[in-house]
């Protein structure tokens, strides 16, 4: 089990230090998730609680990764993103697949198998699997918009566009194509900001769907 305490498989611009918080800039940027989560929780309501808890969970797991800088904490970070995309998939697929219990079990098994595959193959396996789940989510949203089960497609496109912009900065950071001495402006940090904003915008999007007259 020693490999779980080894160094992560992805090296970003901010080098890990021998400190209580290994990557202080990246760790600090996770505050964006905490702020978004608290704002959502203060709004009240079912969707605000759901997305507020999601934001807090993603931010906390990501902070643990940046603070401890181990392969195990990298898995925590990836787990947070898998949980996020899993919830989004459930919200969409529950409008397509009527048996919600089977859907929930199927998604849970799929996410668990994804995490196992990440542990086995390491490298960028987590990012590849997460990318595949994102593609499935995009396809489900396009289907729901085209079949009029969802509306406000422009609002969803803006949220996804912001996520995509952050992901591009993340890629630049992971490949060391864009690095700055001020770590709060490095790609991984920017990815945190855009993800926190995306979670809030997706909350607004799904709240609009819940308030729509039933078709």
Language-model features, listed with the residues they occupy:
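Multi-pass alpha-helical transmembrane bundles in non-GPCR membrane proteins
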Residues: 1-215
């Amino acid at each position: 089990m020693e490999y779980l305490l080894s160094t992560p498989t992805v090296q970003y611009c901010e080098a890990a230090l021998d400190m209580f918080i290994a990557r202080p800039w990246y760790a600090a940027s996770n505050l964006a998730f905490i702020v978004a989560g608290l704002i959502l929780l203060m709004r009240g309501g079912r969707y605000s609680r759901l997305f507020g808890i999601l934001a807090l969970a993603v931010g906390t797991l990501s902070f643990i990764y940046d603070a401890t800088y181990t392969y195990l904490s990298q898995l925590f970070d990836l787990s947070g993103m898998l949980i996020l995309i899993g919830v989004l998939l459930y919200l969409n697929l529950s409008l397509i697949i009527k048996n919600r219990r089977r859907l929930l079990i199927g998604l849970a098994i799929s996410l668990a198998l994804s995490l196992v595959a990440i542990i086995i193959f390491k490298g960028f396996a987590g990012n590849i699997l997460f990318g595949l789940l994102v593609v499935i989510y995009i396809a489900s949203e396009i289907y729901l918009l085209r079949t009029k089960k969802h509306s406000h497609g422009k609002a969803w496109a803006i949220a996804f566009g912001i996520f995509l912009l952050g992901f591009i900065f993340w890629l630049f950071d992971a490949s060391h194509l864009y690095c700055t001495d001020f770590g709060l402006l490095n790609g991984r940090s920017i990815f945190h900001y855009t993800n926190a904003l995306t979670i809030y915008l997706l909350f607004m999007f799904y709240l609009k769907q819940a308030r729509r007259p039933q078709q």
